[in-house]
Amino acid sequence: MAPKGSERTVKKVVAENRKARFNYEIVDTYEAGLVLTGTEVKSLREGKANIAESYATDEGGEIWLINSYLPEYLQANRFNHETRRRRKLLLSRREVNRLQGAVNREGMSLIPLRIYFNERGRAKLELALGKGKKLHDKRETSKERDWNRQKNRLLKERG
């Protein structure tokens, strides 16, 4: 048996929102469970989900994931799910209150970053609390990224 300090968390990433870190300044991240049907889980295990255009919102004291795309599971005939239905996110009451306060008072957004399966095989969503970037901030980010690439190339050539 391995010592406790050396345990690694194995996460099988199913879908990732790659533009989120470019369009938003991420302040904090949360791990939320997803309420899914059986065919949605099987579709996720095939790895064909898309959360690039999705967002999360709070309604009635609950957090919902809206506009996420989980394709239909081909082997399920009439018991299939809707591809773009609203999905409830499972968070503790304290986390829900904290997120609602940040969204309502500070004008922040709830951005889904990625869907993955944790080490127990449960589907989880990494949810971020962030502020939208302005155009000049996006330009600054891309300039910084380009400079880091050039710097790494130069260091690689010399050493």
UniProtKB/Swiss-Prot annotation:
Required for rescue of stalled ribosomes mediated by trans-translation. Binds to transfer-messenger RNA (tmRNA), required for stable association of tmRNA with ribosomes. tmRNA and SmpB together mimic tRNA shape, replacing the anticodon stem-loop with SmpB. tmRNA is encoded by the ssrA gene; the 2 termini fold to resemble tRNA(Ala) and it encodes a 'tag peptide', a short internal open reading frame. During trans-translation Ala-aminoacylated tmRNA acts like a tRNA, entering the A-site of stalled ribosomes, displacing the stalled mRNA. Keywords: Cytoplasm, RNA-binding. CDD domains: SmpB (cd09294). GO terms for cellular component: cytosol. It comes from the Bacteria. Belongs to the SmpB family. One of its GO terms (biological process) is trans-translation. It comes from Sinorhizobium medicae (strain WSM419) (Ensifer medicae). One of its GO terms (molecular function) is RNA binding. This is SsrA-binding protein. Disulfide bonds: none annotated. It is found in: Cytoplasm. Residues 133-159 are annotated as: Disordered. InterPro entries: SmpB, SsrA-bd_prot, SsrA-bd_prot_CS. Residues 137-159 have a biased composition (Basic and acidic residues). PANTHER family: SSRA-BINDING PROTEIN, TMRNA-BINDING COMPONENT OF TRANS-TRANSLATION TAGGING COMPLEX. PROSITE patterns: SSRP. It holds the Pfam family SmpB.
